Amino acid sequence: MIASKFGIGQQVRHSLLGYLGVVVDIDPEYSLDEPSPDELAVNDELRAAPWYHVVMEDDNGQPVHTYLAEAQLRSEMRDEHPEQPSMDELARTIRKQLQAPRLRN
């Protein structure tokens, strides 16, 4: 069994670029159907580790969905980010839904 370092709803930072993001889903290993040429360069060890669907903001404050390897992320210690309140709200909303899921039927 593969253990993931980060959880759904957790705030993380891109380790090279420093962008703040929120984990919205986790794959136990690389699982995109058709990798792009850049993704083909990823080594097998990295592909076998967990990969994360992370929502980040672009330079205009618009949400961007990214797919990142565990090695590309680091933990974010702060819970509040006045410069990016939408990321804080997204993380809170996801964590709240995980704690008390809505029954639809």
UniProtKB/Swiss-Prot annotation:
InterPro entries: Hemimethylated_DNA-bd_dom (IPR011722), Hemimethylated_DNA-bd_sf (IPR036623), HspQ (IPR022866)
Entries under Pfam families matching the protein: YccV-like
Signal peptide start-end: none
Listed Gene3D superfamilies: Hemimethylated DNA-binding domain (2.30.30.390)
Subcellular location: Cytoplasm
Cited function: Involved in the degradation of certain denaturated proteins, including DnaA, during heat shock stress.
Designated name of the protein: Heat shock protein HspQ
Organism listed in the record: Salmonella arizonae (strain ATCC BAA-731 / CDC346-86 / RSK2980)
